[in-house]
UniProtKB/Swiss-Prot annotation:
A Gene Ontology molecular function term of the record: alpha-1,4-glucan glucosyltransferase (UDP-glucose donor) activity
Keyword annotations of the record: Glycogen biosynthesis, Glycosyltransferase, Transferase
Gene Ontology biological process terms, A to Z: glycogen biosynthetic process
Record family assignment: Belongs to the glycosyltransferase 1 family. Bacterial/plant glycogen synthase subfamily.
CDD domains, sorted: GT5_Glycogen_synthase_DULL1-like
EC number(s) per entry: 2.4.1.21
Coiled coil stretches, renumbered: none
The name this protein goes by in its record: Glycogen synthase
A Pfam short name: Glycos_transf_1
Enzyme class: transferase
InterPro entries for this protein: Glyco_trans_1 (IPR001296), GS/SS (IPR011835), Starch_synth_cat_dom (IPR013534)
SUPFAM superfamilies named among the record's database cross-references: UDP-Glycosyltransferase/glycogen phosphorylase
Catalysed reactions, semicolon-separated: [(1->4)-alpha-D-glucosyl](n) + ADP-alpha-D-glucose = [(1->4)-alpha-D-glucosyl](n+1) + ADP + H(+)
Length: 478
């Protein structure tokens, strides 16, 4: 089986979020599986975002021209091979030679070009896949283009398509005329309403309808987006195609996130030998200026500071939490009012709260490794990786039971005394405080139970190898 993975970002070359992590990890794991003959990834060439160590490895394959409306656009194809995966980069200075990946007024046109170029160049690449796996709105038009614009190419007839939705909030909206002016197609599908949604061309909706399978990054999120609360206006479309919608959890890279040999932390530990975790806690207290005390429960937070991540809720209840015997370390940037709120409370409670308004990968690893608990109260969370990383490092998540958080964290059961974290269902301040207090109570009164939970969390398998096998099963169903 040949698989082509199409994405707008991919670690380690360039990424802004979870999509980049998936595009970096999943193809690499697929390449190790006996069912897969070859795997390739196709990406825009964001040269300004790519480190020289990778740019220097690129090989020029060929160039061509793609019609994007009235523009006759150059496209250069570069490639490199890494860990069993061939990566193709589509180069165009006008569209991709910019300072960042997204956030421009012509983003729709930029990815229309990418999707058209991808479809046009498959034959020349000499890589006709059995499965073409596209991701989010940026590549969601590809299944439509294969079936409506390039259906005359015999070599494409047997290609099956999978669309993964990483976050349904972002849908790729353009004026309806874009169908003819950019994609060079007739307007029939727009006027019929197939690709139209609320008076706009909706690229994600188009992909949902035309892909052979649609999946999301957790089973719970696959169900949630079929409701008005989480569907962002596309819930009725997803209900209509419910039979082809499913969810597979993302994984984490166990080579990178390994408490036994993580190069970003000074002390190491394992399920068999946990003493290094206590040393990491002391190191974290030292770094943040919090009192050195092994017996005070320490809650870590590493996140974008936004309402989606639940930090407006946290701020509204933070003083109540800080009145308890607790230490909190926060790392992240985001909404100015949330940043300011944490700064205020860190000045008011300097011995209890360390607010670090920054982005620092090494510091993040120290928080994952040195904390007792990890607070992740997201309002919605398609998958989430932080809770998996925390558990890998023996740090128990405190989560809103939503999306991928619900699928990955087993909430503490006070009867059986089992779980891999603590959870709350109702997104309310008082419930959040009660859940945190429950975790603090177990920490203070039931250390044996807590230790058992830590070991249970560390033993969970969130590796990409397991997830890759689930994707192979999905591909085989096509």
């Amino acid at each position: 089986m040949k698989v082509l993975f199409a994405s707008s970002e991919c670690a380690p070359f360039f990424k802004t979020g979870g999509l980049g992590d998936v595009a970096g990890a999943l193809p690499k794991e697929l390449a190790k599986k006996s069912e897969i003959d070859s795997v390739a990834v196709i990406l825009p060439y964001f040269k300004n975002e790519m480190k020289e160590e990778y740019r220097s490895l690129l090989k020029d394959e060929f160039y061509d021209f793609v019609d994007v409306g009235w523009r006759h656009e150059y496209v250069g194809v570069k490639s490199l091979e890494k860990e069993g995966v061939k990566y193709y980069f589509l180069d165009n200075e006008h569209y991709f030679g910019r300072g960042q990946l997204y956030g421009y007024g012509d983003d729709g046109e930029r990815f229309a070009f990418f999707d058209l170029a991808l479809c046009q160049l498959l034959e020349k690449l000499d890589f006709i896949p059995d499965v073409l796996h596209v991701n989010d709105w940026q590549t969601a038009m590809v299944p439509f283009l294969l079936k409506e614009k390039y259906n005359w190419i015999k070599a494409y007839e047997k290609i099956k398509t999978v669309l993964t939705i990483h976050n349904i909030e972002f849908q790729g909206l353009m004026h309806g005329d874009a169908l003819s002016e950019l994609f060079g197609m007739g307007m029939e599908r727009y006027f019929e309403g197939v690709v139209r949604h609320n008076g706009m061309l909706n690229m994600l909706k188009t992909g949902i309808l035309y892909a052979d399978r649609v999946n999301t990054v957790s089973p719970t999120y696959a169900k949630e987006i079929q409701t008005s609360e989480f569907g962002c206006g596309l819930e009725s479309i997803l209900q209509y195609v419910d039979g082809k919608v499913s969810g597979i959890l993302n994984g984490i890279d166990y080579d990178i996130y390994n408490p036994e040999n993580d190069i970003l932390i000074p002390y190491h530990f394992s399920e068999e030998e946990l003493s290094g975790k206590g040393q990491m806690k002391a190191e974290l207290q030292k770094r943040t200026g919090l009192p050195l005390n092994p017996n005070v429960p320490l809650i870590g937070m590493v996140s974008r500071l936004t309402n989606q991540k639940g930090f407006d809720l946290v701020l509204s209840q933070l003083e109540k939490v800080l009145e308890e015997n607790v230490q909190i370390v926060l790392l992240g940037t985001g909404f100015p009012e949330i940043e300011e709120g944490f700064r205020y409370f860190s000045q008011k409670y300097p011995d209890k709260l360390s607010a670090n308004i920054a982005f620092d990968i090494q510091f993040a690893q120290e928080i994952y490794a040195g904390s007792d608990f990890f607070l992740m109260p997201s309002a919605f969370e398609p998958c989430g990786l932080s809770q998996m990383i925390a558990m890998r490092y023996g740090t128990l998540p405190i989560v809103h039971e939503i999306g991928g958080l619900k699928d990955t964290v087993i909430p503490f059961n006070p009867i059986s005394k089992e779980g891999t974290g603590f959870g709350f269902v109702d997104f309310e301040g008082q419930i959040l405080v009660e859940t945190i207090n429950r975790a603090l109570e177990v920490y203070g009164k039931e250390p044996e139970v807590l230790n058992k939970m830590v070991l249970s969390a560390m033993s969970k398998d969130f590796s990409w190898g397991t997830k890759a096998q689930q994707y192979i099963e999905l591909y085989q169903e096509l």
